[in-house]
Amino acid sequence: MKSLILSAAALALTAVLPAQASEDLAKKHLCTTCHVVKGAKTIGPAYADVAKKYAGQKDAEAKLADKVKKGGQGVWGQVPMPPNAAVPDADLKALVKWILSVK
C-alpha cells in the first residue's frame, strides 16, 4: 500500500514538473517580461493565443523555435520580438513544446 501511494505521488509530480519547469524557463530567459501564460495580450501575445495560432501546423515547433531564436515583427502587431539567440537549444525545445501545449 505504501509503495502504491509513493508511486502515485511520483506520477503526479512528473505530470506537474514539466509545465512548471517550462514556465520557470520562460522566467529565466525573460520571456515573461512581454508574455503571459493566459489572458490579455501585454506587449507580446499570451502563450495560450500562440498555441491556438499554431495548433494543427505540422511545422509549428520549428516555426516557433525560429521566432524565438531570430525574433520577428508584424505577426502579433508592430512591436518587434527581439531575437533570443542565447537560449540554449535544450531550453528552447522545452519552451516551445510547453508554449504549444498551453490551453
Residue locations for each model-derived region?
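Post-cleavage N-terminal segment of exported redox proteins
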Residues: 1-20, 98-103
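Sequence/structural segment immediately N-terminal to covalent heme-attachment motifs in c-type
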Residues: 20-37
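Axial heme c-ligation environment in periplasmic c-type cytochrome domains
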Residues: 33, 42-54, 66-96
